[in-house]
Curated annotation (Swiss-Prot):
A zinc finger (PHD-type) spans 475-531. Residues 1-298 are annotated as: Interaction with DNMT1 and DNMT3A. One of its GO terms (cellular component) is nucleoplasm. Activated by binding to the regulatory factor DNMT3L. Required for genome-wide de novo methylation and is essential for the establishment of DNA methylation patterns during development. DNA methylation is coordinated with methylation of histones. May preferentially methylates nucleosomal DNA within the nucleosome core region. May function as transcriptional co-repressor by associating with CBX4 and independently of DNA methylation. Seems to be involved in gene silencing. Residues 435-527 are annotated as: Interaction with the PRC2/EED-EZH2 complex. One of its GO terms (biological process) is positive regulation of gene expression. Belongs to the class I-like SAM-binding methyltransferase superfamily. C5-methyltransferase family. Sumoylated. Citrullinated by PADI4. Residues 72-81 have a biased composition (Acidic residues). This is DNA (cytosine-5)-methyltransferase 3B. The lineage of its organism: Eukaryota, Metazoa, Chordata, Craniata, Vertebrata. The keyword Ligase does not apply. Its EC number is 2.1.1.37. The gene is DNMT3B.
């Protein structure tokens, strides 16, 4: 099959709903109070074509920033600091192979994440799952038919937020003659304590016929007041809701063919076409297992919906006071999947009464101090955080100024990307005058790869997600806009770029995406020799611009670090090092390779395998002091003084790749502060002018807010260095510090192995020059959209051997071959380590300050 496409699921959980008021067909600029969440899931793959469900652009950057709260609601299933998201034990899925050899399934929870079950994007345009029922009255959206890491048991649409200025279209690409829908949400944010104290509260809906109107919803359509339904609006996933009277919403009456619904979980209201509602009784066809596994908000919404159904059906379930949310949900879900027996769907119907919000059991957002959110004013979409505020009653909507607008009216700035492209094509404006990602005027930064700018929102998203890669090694999002719902993957095995259909259609030309799907192989616009394609024009100096883009994200300006003059050779002495989160002693290895004498090397490390490597390979010259959290100021004074403090705290709870991450202030993220206070303990006392250096490392794909907080504490901005410049593998990392010349260009030495073939053993042939980022996961070894083995030996494909992995990272051969460790354990050690050539580049200037051998 030709074509290399990746479908991104545009489904957004109902928690991601955006407020929109349609006036003469235009969407008013509604502010948003709740940030969106990023949930990336992968879907089945057809040979030559890949699909994945992604969030859309403006939600993605803020989305990831709140997973800390998403997983911190006390459910306990998410967040233990592991490098992979922890799924609930309730529904673990197993991978199933497709009957067709051209179709592969990949499931997030399965043993192998490289296989996906996916119907052909050309043969089916609807969302499909194993339990899809043709008789369902709802037509699934066409453009987001497939999901990343889709589950094999049910149609499981995944969140993919639309743009910040979205007009919610409820038609699902079908004709809708009932007018334009209106969605109403409440401006509120969640306090941190709400996630703990709010429990499973939600706005209580009770029967109150006095608030109803006997003539309401008399349009011949299904569903009346009080009916429990699944709600569907274009761009968002199925979410449980209850049909309510317009009087409960403090809004106008619904238009003919429309219904006001209140969403379970956060109590927001939306006006939805009756044709986009399905009875809650059709549970198995619309229950989203992938979303259930990922989102606390979805699980809570399920609990509230099934609790209401249970009460109506007179059903009881055994429970005990200590039961968790999952313990309570398990029998409920079994009951729902079993058809709500014994009463069935009939038992879920209301008693012809009008449900309204019980004012005595809810609190208005204005009744308590709201936690400020960076994206609070930018998008109004439900997130997992909102579920914790489910006991708030929706208050009247109010307009709020965009947080990046500096108080100006943005009416003159807003324009569509189509309009921008048209103006550029007609020489009415310049590409640099608009955001290449969304079209907004007056960008605040340049696009690093293509001519054009980036607005503040798109710039932050680009900073967070550009270096985020999937398990197959490709970028998680479009190279142009860092979002996209359907992505086309470059066929060049050494290229990791992908481009979304929207960017191709708007910037290159209408019909370009369709043509690209038919091309095999297809080369992306970073690989093609010509620079210009429509209004998409690759910069001549894109590689320099890319480096400058990440290093120019200053956020705040800090004083330049103190510069120490070089020490005369006769006065230089051995270096004394404190290494926190030492790993496999990369710092010590590099210092010895540079010929710098090491007077003492005190290392904090808790991994026994890492300690074994450092002890054996460096013959006991490293003093290990165990857990960094147990080191005191007195210890530093006893072990010191130190000339160099280095470290890189675990990235599990900082990396955007981990949907269950907790952020900088929870989980392993807070270990950064251990580095911070030990660094301060190690600094020379006032009046001591001896040279003192330090360096802190972490991932690039982190939340912009976390990055800037780290910079604020360390009082400097990071430099970004990708190991691809000095090795055979991608590995982009941020480095903070005061090492001399940290921001100088990275130049490979003659001994650096820049291509994979240079790293292989005898009689082994590399199938590509460079490999993607190697992580602790075994599937990171395979390359490309087809998950190819990178090596051929005696005519057979093979994975990389441990010795070859060591060469790629710059370590000596057999460096990790200690303590009878197996291949998997050795790869985990390497996957958490630093790239030796990069650290050598950073440490090289220290030769002017310390004695050398």
């Amino acid at each position: 099959m030709k074509g290399d496409t990746r479908h991104l699921n545009g489904e957004e959980d109902a928690g991601g709903r955006e407020d929109s008021i349609l006036v003469n067909g235009a969407c008013s600029d509604q502010s948003s109070d709740s940030p969106p969440i990023l949930e990336a899931i992968r879907t089945p793959e057809i040979r030559g074509r890949r699909s994945s469900s992604r969030l859309s652009k403006r939600e993605v950057s803020s989305l990831l920033s709140y997973t800390q709260d998403l997983t911190g609601d006390g459910d306990g299933e998410d967040g233990d600091g592991s490098d992979t998201p922890v799924m609930p034990k309730l529904f673990r899925e197993t991978r199933t192979r497709s009957e067709s050899p051209a179709v592969r399934t990949r499931n997030n929870n399965s043993v192998s994440s490289r296989e996906r079950h996916r119907p052909s994007p050309r043969s089916t345009r609807g969302r499909q799952g194993r339990n899809h029922v043709d008789e369902s009255p709802v037509e699934f959206p066409a453009t987001r038919s497939l999901r990343r890491r889709a589950t094999a048991s049910a149609g499981t649409p995944w969140p993919s937020p639309p743009s910040s200025y979205l007009t919610i279209d409820l038609t699902d690409d079908t004709e809708d003659t009932h007018g334009t829908p209106q969605s109403s949400s409440t401006p509120y944010a969640r306090l941190a304590q709400d996630s703990q104290q709010g429990g499973m509260e939600s706005p209580q809906v009770e029967a109150d016929s006095g608030d109803g109107d006997s003539s309401e919803y008399q349009d011949g359509k299904e569903f009346g007041i009080g009916d429990l339904v699944w709600g569907k609006i274009k761009g968002f996933s199925w979410w449980p809701a209850m049909v309510v009277s317009w009087k409960a919403t403090s809004k106008r009456q619904a238009m003919s063919g429309m219904r006001w619904v209140q969403w379970f979980g956060d109590g927001k209201f939306s006006e939805v076409s009756a044709d986009k509602l399905v009875a809650l009784g059709l549970f198995s066809q619309h229950f989203n297992l992938a979303t259930f596994n990922k989102l606390v908000s979805y699980r809570k919404a399920m609990y509230h919906a099934l609790e209401k159904a249970r009460v109506r059906a007179g059903k009881t379930f055994p429970s005990s006071p200590g039961d968790s949310l999952e313990d309570q949900l398990k029998p409920m879900l079994e009951w729902a999947h079993g058809g709500f027996k014994p009463t069935g769907i009939e038992g879920l119907k209301p008693n012809n009464t009008q449900p309204v919000v019980n004012k005595s059991k809810v609190r208005r957002a204005g009744s308590r101090k709201l936690e400020s959110r960076k994206y609070e004013n930018k998008t109004r979409r439900r997130t997992a955080d909102d579920s914790a505020t489910s006991d708030y009653c929706p208050a009247p909507k109010r307009l709020k100024t965009n947080c990046y607008n500096n108080g100006k009216d943005r009416g003159d700035e807003d324009q569509s990307r189509e309009q921008m492209a048209s103006d550029v094509a007609n020489n009415k404006s310049s590409l640099e005058d608009g955001c290449l990602s969304c079209g907004r005027k007056n960008p605040v930064s340049f696009h690093p790869l293509f001519e054009g700018g980036l607005c503040q929102t798109c710039r932050d998203r680009f900073l967070e997600l550009f270096y985020m890669y999937d398990d197959d090694g490709y970028q998680s999002y479009c190279t142009v806009c860092c979002e996209g719902r359907e992505l086309l993957l470059c066929s060049n095995t050494s290229c990791c770029r992908c481009f979304c259909v929207e960017c191709l259609e708007v910037l290159v030309g209408t019909g370009t995406a369709a043509e690209a799907k038919l091309q095999e192989p297809w080369s992306c616009y970073m690989c093609l020799p010509q620079r210009c394609h429509g209004v998409l024009r690759r910069r001549k100096d894109w590689n320099v611009r890319l480096q400058a883009f990440f290093t120019s994200d200053t956020g705040l300006e800090y004083e330049a670090p103190k510069l120490y003059p070089a020490i005369p050779a006769a006065r230089r002495r051995p270096i004394r090092v404190l290494s926190l989160f030492d790993g496999i002693a990369t710092g010590y290895l590099v210092l010895k390779e540079l010929g710098i004498k090491v007077g003492k090397y005190v290392a904090s490390e808790v991994c026994e395998e890492s300690i074994a490597v450092g002890t054996v390979k460096h013959e006991g010259n490293i003093k290990y002091v165990n857990d960094v959290r147990n080191i005191t100021k007195k210890n530093i004074e006893e072990w010191g003084p130190f000339d160099l403090v280095i470290g890189g705290s675990p990235c599990n709870d900082l990396s955007n790749v981990n949907p269950a991450r907790k952020g900088l202030y929870e989980g392993t993220g807070r270990l950064f502060f251990e580095f911070y206070h030990l660094l301060n303990y190690s600094r020379p006392k006032e009046g001591d002018d001896r040279p003192f250096f330090w360096m802190f490392e972490n991932v690039v794909a982190m939340k912009v807010g976390d990055k800037r907080d780290i910079s604020r504490f360390l009082e400097c901005n990071p430099v970004m260095i990708d190991a691809i410049k000095v090795s055979a593998a991608h590995r982009a990392r941020y480095f903070w510090g005061n090492l001399p010349g940290m921001n100088r260009p990275v130049i490979a030495s003659k001994n650096d192995k820049l291509e994979l073939q240079d790293c292989l053993e005898y009689n082994r042939i590399a199938k590509l020059k460079k490999v993607q980022t190697i992580t602790t996961k075994s599937n990171s070894i395979k390359q490309g959209k087809n998950q190819l083995f990178p090596v051929v030996m005696n005519g057979k494909e093979d994975v990389l051997w441990c010795t070859e992995l060591e060469r790629i990272f710059g370590f000596p051969v057999h460096y990790t071959d200690v303590s009878n460790m197996g291949r998997g354990a050795r790869q985990k050690l390497l996957g958490r380590s630093w790239s030796v050539p990069v650290i050598r580049h950073l440490f090289a200037p220290l030769k002017d300050y310390f004695a050398c051998e």
